[in-house]
Each structure stands twice: as structure tokens, then as C-alpha cells.
């Protein structure tokens, strides 16, 4: 075994091509990313091309950090790019189906979790690991969806798409991290996937936002990748509108978390906060950087961000600095190259359906191949599992190269009225039972 730090003193890029690897250490409590040497790239990493694996390790995964999963998981630290074009490094967790024999290949799904926080406790590379202390992270529950993809016989890449600083809401760079995570998975000899592997994207809510950035960026940023389809579940099409919608509600912690993160990406926003936020507001934003998603929602329930300002909130939101941030973070600046399936609840209390209508129209007008499922009966949380069977079948068809003969731009037919939903949900219930009890998943496509 090569220790991660052994190459850190190298100058230039002479270590590229021989990334060190850590073998599996069982029952070891993981360190937080901020304290874990694995996350710190070696000297000269900026000379590597995006997607280069910098180091790797085998890890144990567990549901809610407690129930070990009998899966093969490898974490890859890789070189990627932030929104300003500067090099950075982040981690993806790659899981391969248990039944995949050496030399065999399979489709690769990049699954983007709803990290929705700055705290590294919520990063998938930490929260999915055995003995992780990540209470309040939404990421831990998403192991159920990841397992459903594994049961299809697909390999799954789960990137820390917010990057090493957890910059939730920042534009463009989540897509770069997703795409470079895919490159890293294909480049890794430890994972053993073919470079010609067909690739899919899937994410919901905050994960849908990251998936949308990847779908928009892949044509220009990663034309080398064979991305055959992207599923964008309730993808937060307009952060500015969502801020206004949720501020002062029971979910006010979500836009507050976004502001806490975006001030690190936009100097203009940081300057406005410094000039107009009171001491309590600045202290609160600092505390939010360490909170999990659930912690922040509980702490901020019903709070109005205007209470922490010296001027009316709407006046602050109308300043050029804030208008620039909200304009920059709005999806639709580019058109996805691969076909996309957009899933959105009409009666979503978190994401306004009109924002997603506008996004779907923008993509379609730009020439994208869009299937838009506009669900009449579901709401934000329930639609994710209810739409999973449809999502998995749609991705299966894309991996198989089937043409999109049924090009639906919009439908209000509820998922719950589709008989196939119940067959799929029954299958997902079996998968969930196996995950919760720590039993091995066998390949059994929907």
C-alpha cells in the first residue's frame, strides 16, 4: 500500500499516471474531509488534465452510517475545474455491481445527491461511509436510489459535486465536477470500466440542479464522454425565484444555506453582506457553513432574511450585485447535448413548476430532445421515489440505444396512475429492504 502523502512533495507533474492507492481498512471511522489527508491534492496536480485520478482508496459504505453494505466501493480524488476555470480537486465514490466479472463492462450512471449544505458531513464521500456521523444529511437516504441503479447492473459514480468547500448553488462548476468525476471513473484502473462505456446522469432537487449543469456543459466541456441521457428531477431552475419563494417559510434554511455558500463565489455578494447584514446575520451565515441540511432547516424555520439587514430585503435583492448572482445561477445558459427527462411536481411547495416549465421550453427551443413529465398529484419529496421506476426504464432505453419515438414535451398524467409505477415501487421496496438489512443486491432490472 502506498501512503497518500508519499508523492505530495513531488514537484511539477512527475507523479501523474501513478496515483497512490489505499487498500480497504475495515471498521475505521472516517475523518471529516476537512481533516482527511486523502482530500488534499499533491503538489503539481494543477498540471494534470481534468479527470485525472490523483489518488484512490477502497472504502466501506453503510446505510445511515450504521448498516454495512456488501458492495465494492472505490473513492477517487481527481483534478477538476471551478467556475472561474481554476484547477481544484474533489472526490467521487464509484460503486460497481457485485456480479460484474473482471473484463466485463456495464453502463455508468453518475448519480448526483442533494447535498444541499456546505458542511462536509453532507458530502457523499463522507456521508455514505460506514461509521460516518452525518445525522441531518439528506445524502444518506439517497443510498436507496443508488442501490436501485446497482440492481440494474450499472456502475455508479457519486461525486462531491459541490467541491471541497461545499459551494452549494454556484453555477457551472457542479457540472464540471460531475463530468470530471465520470472521466476519473473511466480512467481508473481500479474501477476497470471501458472508455466506451455509455453514461447516464440522474439527480433530484439539489442533485437535479447539478445534473442539469452537467447536461448543459457536456457538449463543450466533455465531448469525449458518451452521455446518452440525463434525468433532471425538480432541478431548481431559478435560484433567485426559489429564494423569494422560500424565505420566511418553514424551509427558509435552504435559501439561507445558498446565500452562505454563494458569498464565497461572488465577491459582490460578500461585499453586500458585509455592508448591510447586522452582527446576528453575519454570525448566522458563519454558523450555517457547519450545519447539515436538516439542522439548518430546523434552525431557520420561519425566519426572514430581511430581519438581518439594515435595509428592506427587496431593495437589497434589486442591487446590481445580487441581480448578477441570481442571473448567473439560473439554469438555461446552454442547451443539453444528450436527451433529457425532466421530472417536476405541479404542486411542489419547494420548486415553482413555472420555473421548470420555462427551463423545459428553453431547452426545447434550443433544439434539445426533452421529455417533460409534469406530475399533477405528487409533491416534492414523494415524486423522487415515485418517478424512480420511470427514470430507470428511461435510462435503460438510452443505454440500449433505443430511439426516443415518444417525444413528449409535457404531460400532466400522474405517475401514481401508471400501473408500471406499482410494479417498480414493489421492486424498489425489495431493494430498500435489502439495503436496510445489509443484504447483498442481485442484478434484477425493472
Swiss-Prot record:
It comes from the Bacteria. Signal peptide: none annotated. GO terms for biological process: lipid catabolic process. Was identified as a high-confidence drug target. Induction: A possible member of the dormancy regulon. Induced in response to reduced oxygen tension (hypoxia). It is hoped that this regulon will give insight into the latent, or dormant phase of infection. Disulfide bonds: none annotated. The lineage of its organism: Bacteria, Bacillati, Actinomycetota, Actinomycetes, Mycobacteriales. One of its GO terms (molecular function) is triacylglycerol lipase activity. Pfam families: LIP (PF03583). SUPFAM superfamilies: alpha/beta-Hydrolases. This is Probable inactive lipase Rv1592c. InterPro entries: AB_hydrolase_fold (IPR029058), Lipase_secreted (IPR005152). Belongs to the AB hydrolase superfamily. Lipase family.
